[in-house]
Design a protein with these regions (language model features):
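Glycine-centered flexibility motif
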Residues: 1-2, 42, 100, 132
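Catalytic core of membrane glycerolipid acyltransferases/transacylases, capturing the structured
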Residues: 2-58
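Non-catalytic C-terminal accessory region of glycerolipid acyltransferases
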Residues: 62-175
Length: 175
């Protein structure tokens, strides 16, 4: 019920599709404006009303934060990758989360849903050939009451740790 922010680890171009395919209700996402103008990506962004963030424009970044926070507070669901990018063939390694990514959650006072993506990088961002099974794990939401007194870096660390723990748990279970 209501809006919330989804914060997954970022593995590659397939991530948004994997999440949107498995998510039970409509949602949108925030992405780098420069990468949003390629064929099909532009149309997909327009279709789901994604927000295009200019990474080198702090003023526009504040505008996007405010717009998304307002929409989330009004009930919309958004995906934002706090790593800010991904590496080719990343082998399920989670990079540092950018603390500023969590300003939207704080501003909207919405729940945070950590998402652990596993093997998503293999679809478009590796040399893997053949069928691939990817995993999307929606972790227990973190309610505003749980993080309201925390700094954005503390929230980023909390979400990252939960995602890393889930990935480790799943990797051990599938050995």
């Amino acid at each position: 019920q209501g809006g919330y922010m989804m914060y997954p680890n970022h593995q590659g171009k397939y991530d948004v599709l994997g999440i949107m395919y498995t998510h039970k209700s409509p949602c949108s996402f925030v992405m780098d404006k420069r990468k949003s103008h390629t064929i099909l990506v532009r149309e997909f962004c327009d279709l789901v009303q994604a927000k295009r963030l200019e990474k080198d424009n702090p003023r526009q970044g504040i505008t996007i934060i405010n717009q998304v926070a307002k929409e989330v507070a009004a009930g919309k669901k958004y995906i934002l990758f706090p790593e800010g990018g991904y590496r080719f063939n990343n082998k399920n390694k989670v990079c540092d989360f950018k603390a500023g990514s969590f300003k939207i959650a704080l501003k909207s006072r919405a729940p945070i849903v950590p998402i652990a993506l596993i093997d998503s990088y293999k679809v478009f961002n590796s040399f893997h050939i053949g069928p691939i099974t990817t995993y999307v794990h929606y972790l227990k939401p973190i309610c505003y009451e749980e993080y309201k007194g925390m700094k954005t870096q503390e929230i980023a660390d909390l979400v990252k740790i939960r995602i890393e723990e889930k990935i480790q748990q799943e990797m051990q279970a599938h050995k």
